[in-house]
Amino acid sequence: MHTHNNFKTPSDADELDDLDDDMVIGVIEEIAQEALVGEDVSDSDIDEHDLADVGAPEHNQNADENESISSDSSFDPNAEDSSDSDDSMLEEDEAEGASSGEATSAKRRKDDNDGPCGSAADSAAVDLDDLDDETDETVRAIIAAIKKPRSAPPEIKLEDFITDVCFHPDRDIIALATIIGDVHLYEYGNEGNKLLRTIEVHSKACRDVEFTEDGRYLLTASKDKCVMVTDLETEKLKKLYETAHDDAINKLHVLDENLFATGDDAGTVKLWDLRTKNPIFELKEVEDQITQMITNDQKKLLLATSADGYLTTFNIAARKLYVQSEPYEEELNCMGIYRGSSKLVVGTSKGKLYSYNWGYFGYHCDMYPGIKSPVSLMIPITDRIACVAGEDGNIRACHITPYRNLGVVGQHNMPIESLDINTSGELLASSSHNNDVRFWNVKYFEDFGDIKYNDKHNAYKEKRHNLPSSKCTNASDFFSDLTKEDEDNADNNDAAAGPSNSA
């Protein structure tokens, strides 16, 4: 502050450093406190500001005083300061400032109760414009971010690697499968998440976890070749399919409250009924890992993708192969059904998206370039919008037929391992190799309009555009805010100027 110029130079340089640091910290605390309370600048701050300006001499006066001091032969710069001079002056200033601050704070509270029409409120409003705009806006932005209500639950962090996530169909519960064979059940909410229970189900990695359609049972498939069915109410084991496969089970798909399918690392697919002990049927049409299985609402066909590049379709009622696609020179990792069950889209290890007409799964009808990085996960958000993710750690949204990149839904620091969406379609959950689960509110997709084939678009910008759920912001948003600010200021100036008088 300017008043420091009137103090003598202390003999120890550290004293001056400590004094400046304390005063800087005090000023920062005052600004933060004022912003948190949500009030204007207090009269005490205004008085201190005025005192500082009064205590600071004019340029010419300061020059004259410096000349008089330098001409004084009795001044010794190496002499020790008297302990009473600076300390007493500082204590008096602090005491006077404290008493003045208390009085003006009480007056300000009275003025606030009376309304903003008082002179103190007017002077505070005037001096608020004199503050540093950058500092003021920064503090307000921080406080606004803190007070802004959450739109999604906070992150869940585990010590063990998370292999799969699954939302409960009716309750705000999410199941997290881990590499040590346990399943953690969390109750999630915007205010916080609560661990309900941990179920020890497998001796090896639990690769897939699913709820039945009625939400009564929890099904898990593991590397130990077993399938476990757990009753959620009693937390007891309902059924154990020991050695359900000859190889490690990789995927599990629930068809309804009784039927489910499993696929293993060797390409075998089995269909099960909870009311029976043995599988309904078993087919092996590929030689590599089953990466995903899916059915539509009619549940007549069971589709399976595999790591050796095949899309295989089974007729459930006939219990036999329906059709198998031509082989692809890439892994088929994931798929989703869109356009009223008229389109099937498959994601590959080369980042491509193949589109099939429903029922014609021998060869794709369209190929989209995708994101140019391996697509290992896909979740339908709406009937025309999909979320895809993979090794780059980004969750991207894309429009199906016509294909368009819509932007980035969310990010992880490491490759993404699993994706799921809740029953309402508003909340997306993702887990990564960093042992974390993050939630993304994707309700805004309900307002997305349909994209036409002849719509103009910029593919480069769309691929890097951050959507509202993303933790990152777009550079263009900063300039758009500035433009909006300028427009608002121009409107205010026009309103203040009023109608012009014609000559």
Swiss-Prot record:
Residues 12-21, 40-50, 78-96 have a biased composition (Acidic residues). It comes from the Eukaryota. GO terms for biological process: defense response to Gram-negative bacterium. It comes from Drosophila persimilis (Fruit fly). WD repeats lie at residues 157-196, 201-242, 244-282, 285-324, 327-366, 411-450. Pfam families: WDR55 (PF24796). PANTHER family: WD REPEAT-CONTAINING PROTEIN 55. Coiled coil: none annotated. This is WD repeat-containing protein 55 homolog. InterPro entries: WD40/YVTN_repeat-like_dom_sf, WD40_repeat_CS, WD40_repeat_dom_sf, WD40_rpt, WDR55_POC1. The keyword Repeat applies.
